C-alpha cells in the first residue's frame, strides 16, 4: 500500500458498533482514536510524513481484534484511469506486444522497494456506494509486473 506523503490521509472501515478503534502509525508512533458508530463504521485522518522508501506499518485495534498493515510506503500516489489504453498490461495482449514491455518486466525487480501497484476491481452500480470496491497492492517485481498497466508504468 502507498499513502500520500506530507498530508492527512483518510482511513475508514467497519468494526464493532459503538466501540472505539485505535490506529498507531510506525513513522511517528502517534495513536489516533476513532469512535465506531452504531452501524459499525468509523473513519479517521492520519498525518503522513515526507516520502521515504522505508517500509512503515499501521496497527489497528478494536477490543481484542488487531490488524497490522505491513510493507506500507509513504510517497506519491498516482492514479491511471481510462479505457483500453490504460488497461493494456505490460505483457501486452495477444498479438499486440508492448514495445519495451519484456525488458521492463525483466528489470522491474529494481523497483521492488519503491513502486506499488493496485488494480481496482471493475464493478457497476446504479446507486452510489458507501465504500470503494476492492483491489490489492502488488510489489513491483517480474512476477507481478506483467499485469501492471503499461501506460501507467512507463
Predicted regions span which residues?
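Cell-envelope and extracellular/periplasmic
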Residues: 1-154
Amino acid at each position: 500500500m502507498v499513502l500520500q506523503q506530507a498530508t492527512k490521509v483518510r482511513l475508514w472501515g467497519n468494526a464493532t458498533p459503538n466501540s472505539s478503534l485505535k490506529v498507531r502509525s510506525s513513522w511517528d508512533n502517534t495513536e489516533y482514536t476513532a469512535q465506531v458508530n452504531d452501524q459499525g463504521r468509523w473513519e479517521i485522518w492520519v498525518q503522513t510524513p515526507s516520502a521515504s522508501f522505508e517500509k512503515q506499518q499501521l496497527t489497528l485495534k478494536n477490543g481484542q481484534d488487531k490488524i497490522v498493515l505491513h510493507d506500507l510506503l509513504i510517497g506519491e500516489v498516482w492514479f491511471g484511469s481510462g479505457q483500453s489504453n490504460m488497461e493494456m498490461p505490460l505483457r501486452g495482449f495477444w498479438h499486440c506486444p508492448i514495445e519495451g514491455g519484456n525488458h521492463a518486466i525483466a528489470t522491474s525487480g529494481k523497483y521492488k522497494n519503491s513502486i506499488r501497484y493496485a488494480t481496482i476491481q471493475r464493478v457497476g452500480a446504479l446507486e452510489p456506494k458507501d465504500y470503494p470496491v476492492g483491489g490489492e497492492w502488488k510489489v513491483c517485481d517480474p512476477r507481478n509486473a506483467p499485469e501492471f498497466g503499461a501506460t501507467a508504468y512507463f
